[in-house]
Curated annotation (Swiss-Prot):
Name under which the protein is recorded: Gag polyprotein
GO cellular component annotations of the record: host cell nucleus; host cell plasma membrane; host multivesicular body; membrane; viral nucleocapsid; virion membrane
Organism of origin: Human immunodeficiency virus type 1 group M subtype D (isolate ELI)
Gene (name only): gag
Domain topic, free-text comment: Late-budding domains (L domains) are short sequence motifs essential for viral particle budding. They recruit proteins of the host ESCRT machinery (Endosomal Sorting Complex Required for Transport) or ESCRT-associated proteins. p6-gag contains two L domains: a PTAP/PSAP motif, which interacts with the UEV domain of TSG101 and a LYPX(n)L motif which interacts with PDCD6IP/AIP1.
Positions carrying Asymmetric dimethylarginine: 388, 410
Single GO term (MF): zinc ion binding
Species classification: Viruses, Riboviria, Pararnavirae, Artverviricota, Revtraviricetes
Amino acid sequence: MGARASVLSGGKLDKWEKIRLRPGGKKKYRLKHIVWASRELERYALNPGLLETSEGCKQIIGQLQPAIQTGTEELRSLYNTVATLYCVHKGIDVKDTKEALEKMEEEQNKSKKKAQQAAADTGNNSQVSQNYPIVQNLQGQMVHQAISPRTLNAWVKVIEEKAFSPEVIPMFSALSEGATPQDLNTMLNTVGGHQAAMQMLKETINEEAAEWDRLHPVHAGPIAPGQMREPRGSDIAGTTSTLQEQIAWMTSNPPIPVGEIYKRWIIVGLNKIVRMYSPVSILDIRQGPKEPFRDYVDRFYKTLRAEQASQDVKNWMTETLLVQNANPDCKTILKALGPQATLEEMMTACQGVGGPSHKARVLAEAMSQATNSVTTAMMQRGNFKGPRKIIKCFNCGKEGHIAKNCRAPRKKGCWRCGKEGHQLKDCTERQANFLGRIWPSHKGRPGNFLQSRPEPTAPPAESFGFGEEITPSQKQEQKDKELYPLTSLKSLFGNDPLSQ
């Protein structure tokens, strides 16, 4: 880390740490941002040592700038960091990243005007391509530098690790900046596997070449002396043209950018391959119930990059589907933010969704709702007994304990009626009859008991055998009539054992 952090020192380091990441924000640049930028440059096969000078930063910006429109957020962050570092090296005072980008744009406009003025002074109104790998040597001739093994190695690693995921396209665009058709074919030939994808790419290139030939027919007649022939589709693809012809077309007046044209054809084919390797539609990207919002956004934008649509359509997809396909928890939060919320605000608001604390809160709310629903259902069915009955002591009459645990002196007599001679279990006060009704004590015994027992007032008449003989059955019937009036319950219970 020490070598990477030594890019700035002294006063430059102080200026660096005073620049804010965003206008009005609290966070400022630190050494860790330079270390991160160095590692990212190594990923893109660029020399991290270029960060030590303003000219090196300018070269890095020239390589990254063409891929900004189609690049990832990491690529844009890297570009912003290098632009800010360039301003620090040049001694330009800036307060934040936005101001550094504006200063950088002003510098580029000034350099373009100077180049145009110099070309006008020399009588050459055309801008000669100075892009790598076509450079101008000391003699003023345009020569070609072969693509470096380091660049090829970076391209092969991307294919091996990412296959043909959407991020392969901006990586290819960055690595092939200013390349000739021969260099582009070298990059494609280094891909060992995925031959089915390579065959699809060849078919797309052939289709684009045929379309070029249809739109640019060959002029009849011989070619004028000192004039170059016009490139055909196969010439642009590098199959029927030499390296010298390709350089001549790219540096002629006016130039024919055969390298850029061929590069566009390859990107069209790569888009088809990416769509084949990523068959998931953006409409199918939905956030799982426990998936963090950050992972959902990553999957969404990765699939969105593979979609073959205009930028306006992609913007509409982002504004609509990103919120619509979120899970219910995040969707509630995102709708509360409003339609003008930025992606940063969305990710900050949904940061805790799906975590342990959020799960506990959701579970507590669900349990509370379930308890309330069960209570409501019980009350509607009439099964709700309400609060439990308060325990009351029979001995002292106080609440909160039972007579077995009572410390007061033992009450004498029955705990129900207060009379002595029997206990509570034998008390006949307020006993229910067979109908479940309480028979008041002042009305005598309950209705299912014999109300009164007839007591004889005179001895029974002796039978001397005179008159009709009374049979035992007749005696029993007569006895029943005396004991049981018409309102008796004998019909229900038979003979009352108390009467025998």
